Amino acid sequence: AALEITRKASNSTISQKILFYAKSRRIDFVTHADWKEHQTLLKVHFPVAVHTDEATFDVQFGNLTRKTHQNTSWDVARFESCGQKWMDLSEGHYGVSLLNDCKYGHSVKDSNMALTLIKSGIEPNPVTDQEEHTFTYAIYPHAENWKAAGTVEEAYKLNQPLLTERNTKAGLDYSFAS
């Protein structure tokens, strides 16, 4: 099933197709933004019912954990963390992963997961990110922890989807079986 939403945000237009799958817990948010804002940060937040002291982030050579609380000045200064395809909050036998196909700024505070979608700063270009954007992020609730739940596999499915192409002239030259 799909739900389509279009919103105006100041001078920008954001259209989303929210996809629900019959045989998957993953919910995809296929987003197109015609972004015209100046010095504005667009984030998505997911407050979740997961209580844990650590979040796990995908990074270029594996994964790492970071604290979810802000007990020290160092914690407060770390308002955003880098990550690649996913971040996860898990406790006991339940968790939620936030997957994405091209966004690298994550934040988590207590049980609130967030992903930076667009940052229209002024350096090095005064019109940075003031253009059309298309990206997908997904929320993936799961049992167990991120490893047992297949979060890495779900992130790869999102980032490298199976593509099909209809070709009526292929014949035996392009057959997998011949």
Report each predicted region and the residues it spans.
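C-terminal (or distal) subdomains of carbohydrate-active enzymes
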Residues: 1-178
